[in-house]
Amino acid sequence: MFTLEVEKGLKLALVEPKFAPQYLEIVTREREYLSQWLAWPQHADSNDFFLSFIKRSLHDYADGKSLVCAMLHGDKLVGNISFNTINQSLKKVQIGYWLSAEHQGKGLVSKSVSKLIDMAFTEHDMQKVEISAAVENHPSRKVCERLGFSLEGIITCSENLNGRVVDHAIYGLSRTAWAET
C-alpha cells in the first residue's frame, strides 16, 4: 500500500481496512471535539461505518478522484488527511484533514499538509491546492496561513455542522506561490 514519510515518526498511509478499529476508537473517544468542525462523527458509530468509508476511499483512489490517508505518529493512527478531490481538468486538489485532540499543537498537520502540497505539485502536476475551513476554526486557518495560502474568500452558509450553520474560508495556493516559499 501507498505510504509517504513526512518525517521520522510521522507518515501518511493509504487507508486500509485494518485502520477501521483505530478510527472508531478515536472518533468514539473524541466525538464531541471532532463534531465542532466535522458533520460525520455524529454518525460514525461502528466498525462497519469506517470499513464502508475505507472501501469508498480506495475505490475513489483507484479512479483517480481522491487520495485518503491515515496520519500515523509512530505506529499510532492519530488523524486523517486527504486530497478530498483531485480535479484533473482544473489541475487542482482540495486538501482536508482532522487530527485527534491529544496530538494537536505538535505541527503534525502542518508538516503533513506541506508534504501533500509537494506531492500535488511534483507528482500530480497540479497548479493549485485549495483548503476550505470553517471561519471559526482558527487552528485550521492558521495551518493555511503558515504554509503561505492566500484567503480567496468567505462562503456564507457553507455547511451545516450538526444544526449549526457555518461560513467557510477558502484558501488557495498556486504552484508558483509554493515555489517561492
Task: List the model feature ranges, each with a label.
Residues 1-22, 26-33, 68-181:
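Acyl-donor (CoA/ACP) binding surface of acyl/acetyltransferases
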Residues 41, 55-69:
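A short helix-loop-beta-strand connector motif used in the catalytic cores of GNAT acetyltransferases and
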